[in-house]
């Protein structure tokens, strides 16, 4: 309780915050980090464009449209008949291609930045708080169970690792919350999973060959090499 | 060649064989063989192969090696080198060196296969035997797992069927898990809510972050919470165990377990480890039952924990 008092944290604050962090962690695990990163990227493209953050993407789209138009124009004329015009267009297309490439690189850099930013946010949201809780509040009692509800041996188990009987610490609380959240997620998602049908074994049906045909097949035409010579 | 429909295939073969034998008996086998070998060549008579039919019988080279004089005038050292196992039994003497090596390998690898090395199964490729042992998660468990049949004899359709069967078994296990989980959570929540409301007293069935809650004298209805809890657990765990053994989803769930896989790998080196696999599968089944109990206890802890927040 000493650390809690020093930080002016009430145990129930810890109960709620650890529950929330574990819930977020389980949800992130369920949705998938890559999916969240993709969503963040799409959000950045949509909102960042309006805010002027993702200018390179807008420029890239414009340049690509221009390139497409140029290529179409270039294809419409003959390189032999209108050589000068074709060369001019080709030069422009090459220049635009180089610009598009450099913009693509910029976008890729932006994307990796967004991905790393999402990673850092998730780290601060899920992993780091749990480590802080484990390090700072490992000796804090989160709550006490009512007397007489559980027998002594169950209270002892719930007081793992070193708390007084009847109290619940962070270790047991985090284990319990993880267990319950994953079970609830399973309960909520399993009905929407596609069912697996009973597999049917494919038995090979052998074709019934008439006896005369079989004997004909088994004794093919004998070629006498010696006779041939 | 006069082909008449009345002659049977066997008879026709026999006639051809006799005619061929008669032709061979006339001699000129070497020239005939060279004609066959130089067919299509622009330069004739380049082949100088001699037919075995025209070779002079050499007599006492290979076949008489077994009839050694026990006390010869002078010892032929080459005979000692070339004759395989002069001290061995007379049966093995006739084998050539290469045949000996083949036989030796067959014996070595045949002897390592469980069972015997002389029957059809034992004379298989030893690598295939090892792979077979490696890919049999159900072996030794006494359960009818999808892999209990020989996977190497299986056709692609059969292999696909086995894969689908594994998927189906896993899905069935999950279905049962879902049903039990729903029943468990419903029963436990009902038990908790019932006691929460029946006691009425805001302290006797309440958890708190304050230690004074432990000093209170417990009321009688609060004790019945654990009685009901343990009854629910006994019924649910017993039914789950019964269904798990009957439907065989304990073995399905444990077939991918690290310990079982390790035992499978170990049994390739030490076949005695197979007997521990049965124990491991059983223990993992019990662990699943323990997980049910711990999961239910977790729900109660979470409910009390959240209640301690609401009570403050």
From Swiss-Prot, chain A:
Regions annotated as coiled coil: 60-117
Residues on Cytoplasmic side: 35-122, 185-229
Membrane topology: Multi-pass membrane protein
Keyword Coiled coil among record annotations: yes
Keyword terms of this UniProt record: Coiled coil, Endoplasmic reticulum, ER-Golgi transport, Golgi apparatus, Membrane, Transmembrane, Transmembrane helix, Transport
A GO term for molecular function: protein-membrane adaptor activity
Functional description taken from the UniProt entry: Required for the post-translational delivery of tail-anchored (TA) proteins to the endoplasmic reticulum. Together with GET2, acts as a membrane receptor for soluble GET3, which recognizes and selectively binds the transmembrane domain of TA proteins in the cytosol. The GET complex cooperates with the HDEL receptor ERD2 to mediate the ATP-dependent retrieval of resident ER proteins that contain a C-terminal H-D-E-L retention signal from the Golgi to the ER.
Subunit annotation: Component of the Golgi to ER traffic (GET) complex, which is composed of GET1, GET2 and GET3. Within the complex, GET1 and GET2 form a heterotetramer which is stabilized by phosphatidylinositol binding and which binds to the GET3 homodimer.
Protein's UniProt name: Golgi to ER traffic protein 1
Organism taxonomic ancestry: Eukaryota, Fungi, Dikarya, Ascomycota, Saccharomycotina
UniProtKB/Swiss-Prot annotation, chain B:
Keywords: Endoplasmic reticulum, ER-Golgi transport, Golgi apparatus, Membrane, Transmembrane, Transmembrane helix, Transport
Intracellular or extracellular location(s): Endoplasmic reticulum membrane; Golgi apparatus membrane
SS bond list: none
Membrane-spanning ranges: 176-196, 225-244, 289-309
Pfam families named among the record's database cross-references: GET2 (PF08690)
Keyword presence, Endoplasmic reticulum: yes
Membrane topology: Multi-pass membrane protein
Coiled coil, from the record: none
Superkingdom of origin: Eukaryota
Keyword Endoplasmic reticulum: yes
Cellular component terms (Gene Ontology): endoplasmic reticulum membrane; GET complex; Golgi membrane
Cytoplasmic side: 1-175, 245-288
Gene Ontology biological process terms from the UniProt entry: protein insertion into ER membrane; retrograde vesicle-mediated transport, Golgi to endoplasmic reticulum
Entries under InterPro entries matching the protein: GET2 (IPR014802), Get2/sif1 (IPR028143)
Lumenal side: 197-224, 310-312
Assembly and oligomerization: Component of the Golgi to ER traffic (GET) complex, which is composed of GET1, GET2 and GET3. Within the complex, GET1 and GET2 form a heterotetramer which is stabilized by phosphatidylinositol binding and which binds to the GET3 homodimer.
Function description: Required for the post-translational delivery of tail-anchored (TA) proteins to the endoplasmic reticulum. Together with GET1, acts as a membrane receptor for soluble GET3, which recognizes and selectively binds the transmembrane domain of TA proteins in the cytosol. The GET complex cooperates with the HDEL receptor ERD2 to mediate the ATP-dependent retrieval of resident ER proteins that contain a C-terminal H-D-E-L retention signal from the Golgi to the ER.
Family statement: Belongs to the GET2 family.
This protein's name: Golgi to ER traffic protein 2
Organism encoding this protein: Scheffersomyces stipitis (strain ATCC 58785 / CBS 6054 / NBRC 10063 / NRRL Y-11545)
Lineage: Eukaryota, Fungi, Dikarya, Ascomycota, Saccharomycotina
